Amino acid sequence: MPLMKTKPTSPGRRSMVKVVNPDLHKGKPFASLLEPQFQKAGRNNNGHITTRHKGGGHKHHYRVVDFKRNDKDGIPAKVERLEYDPNRSANIALILFADGECRYIPAAKGMTVGQAIMNGSEAPIKSGNNLPIRNIPVGSTIHCVEIMPGKGAQVARSAGGSAVLLAREGVYAQVRLRSGEVRRVLIDCRATIGEVGNEEHSLRQIGKAGANRWRGIRPTVRGVAMNPVDHPHGGGEGRTGEGRVPVSPWGTPTKGYRTRRNKRTTSMIVQRRQKR
């Protein structure tokens, strides 16, 4: 997919770079796979802000994407069209099964309209096909990897994402993630062959603040620009630094401080992710 740099007709368009994909469907999405998505603006049921910097943005429907792909084993399908999805960085593909049912799946790299798709242990090792890890050759590049069998894909789902199947040992397989972490997963978990498409997504440039507001992203204010009542870094006469170890608004150390508390799955991590 080519990158398009806009002409500098305004300051906002001077540095804007878009990802252009002429193969995307230009009509409306598949109506029966849409659900209403109500804007929460980062608030919970009490109205309290639980996620900062969210609010506004364009209205859009949620596309029901099939991340499990475990109930159509052995039924051939083909790609009807590729579509834009405002809810994720990757594009999605509408596939039509031989029994007449349509599903949305994440579009794999190189996926084209009319391509044959298959799910199940008997599916060929081809980009876009979904298989149990026990049936995938060691060394294969995979994406949309399950952590628990039947729960649906949780790993390597964003644009350009992928993982590598390193080994199989008994009922577990070792998978190397893009972060460098090597993790054990059950061989009954499923994964999709290939990489996630729209890999140029990371090369786009927003160009102006308003483009982020369209996406529902509000401004991020620095702590040193706040008052002491609002942030531990706030206050001072004139421009000042933090004056202490950098912390979050609630006093938790930041900039590299580890906050992982999920000890239950620590034994599944063979190698921690690499430092950046």
UniProtKB/Swiss-Prot annotation:
GO terms for cellular component: large ribosomal subunit. Transmembrane segments: none annotated. It comes from the Bacteria. Pfam families: Ribosomal_L2 (PF00181), Ribosomal_L2_C (PF03947). GO terms for molecular function: rRNA binding; structural constituent of ribosome; transferase activity. HAMAP family: Ribosomal_uL2_B. One of the primary rRNA binding proteins. Required for association of the 30S and 50S subunits to form the 70S ribosome, for tRNA binding and peptide bond formation. It has been suggested to have peptidyltransferase activity; this is somewhat controversial. Makes several contacts with the 16S rRNA in the 70S ribosome. This is Large ribosomal subunit protein uL2. It comes from Polynucleobacter necessarius subsp. necessarius (strain STIR1).
